[in-house]
Amino acid sequence: MKQLLHTPEGVRDIYKDECARKLALTNRLHKVLHLYGYHDIQTPTFEFFDVFRKEIGTIPSKELYKFFDREGNTLVLRPDMTPQIARVAATLLGEHEFPARLCYVGNTFINHSSYQGRLRESTQIGAEFLGLDSVDADAEMLALVVDCLKKAGLEEFQINVGNVDFFQSLMEDAHVDEETEIRLRELIANRNYFGMDELLTEAEVKRSTREALSALSELVGGVEILEQAKRIAPSSKALKAVKRLEAIYEVLKAYNVSDYISFDLSMCGTYGYYTGIIFRGYTFGTGDAIVKGGRYDQLVEKFGRTMPSIGFAIVIDDLMNALQRQKIRIPHGQKNTLIIYDEGRQKDAVLLAREFRSKDKNTELLMKEEDRSVEFYIDYGKRTLAGGLLYLQNTSQIRMFNLQTGEQKIIKSRD
């Protein structure tokens, strides 16, 4: 019985005002994506396991929701939309359709450990720019993220930008084995630089590389830190990565969004498919990034086609939590009109409701129970966020109540 009445851990029901606010927020963001010329795409909720296998670079297999179809194929609830978009780009889109701007809204499913207390099903809205490797494409993505968050109502937020190529150059210069590199990535991602120094010493990494990796803690801030990054760049690849960030920043000034941009050269990415710039968006009221994105120039190739690409995803649920904690209201405009009627006025009430609905007015219809007062229905209307209440009485009068101002008036109904 317990499992019959409760949802599994990590999923939840969303209804009434919260659901209306979530849909309104999603629609706002969707509109911004369309303003930038992005076209909608829908992908399946589940895919073959191969789409999210380890070699793709997405989340670990143990965090996937896996099941079998009747033929014995292993299927997976999507944990991430990007590999699906890559599959579509490689298999369905023709050469004449690139560069392609695609956007989506959908739920993703990740089997987080129970102790993390995180949602296992979340709603994402995102955009993917396929077929173009350029500073302009990178800058457009970042500008689009900023415009989306501003449209959501946020005023204080920050987009941290890094470059995987810079970080990877340091790893290559360290000459460590795969296991040590994975551990280093974890330590740096968690800002545990003491643990990193200890591990580098144990691995007998040369002093110059240790110093460069230790300097990552200082390579966080405004555009000025890029000069420092160029001084410790261990290779031409790393230097090119920093210069790319400088060029992107110049374009972002033209978009008038550079004030929201900071740099973090220690970013290495949660997913293994990132290849160039990587970015995350942060604001008050949520512990994790509300936006994650970056360039994945080699991902589509794993599905059989070479294609540079960049994209991002906004986690709607986390964004809503941040807005709520910052006391930023999400107007949704879903104000119903509540019509109640005495039993003898049913036909009139139905006709009036039909007239309202024909004019795109949300209308709820209830027959008044004899043992319930009008005040009961007024309270009900306020709880359901109705804007007004009309009471059709057997006396041929209509009592009108403005549930927002408390104003009342009586009119004679039409014959």
What residue ranges belong to the model's regions?
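TRNA-binding/sensing appendages of the translation machinery
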Residues: 1-83, 139, 160
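Short secondary-structure transition/capping segments
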Residues: 4, 52-56, 170, 376-378, ...
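Positively charged, Gly/Ser-enriched RNA/tRNA-binding surfaces
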Residues: 24-32, 48, 82-93, 102-132, ...
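Acidic, His- and aromatic-enriched active-site or binding-groove loops in soluble protein domains
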Residues: 63-69, 176-197, 257
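Short, conserved phosphate-binding/catalytic loop or strand-edge motifs used
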Residues: 120-125, 161-169
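Short, surface-exposed recognition loops or helix-turn segments adjacent to catalytic cores
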Residues: 156-165, 184, 262-266
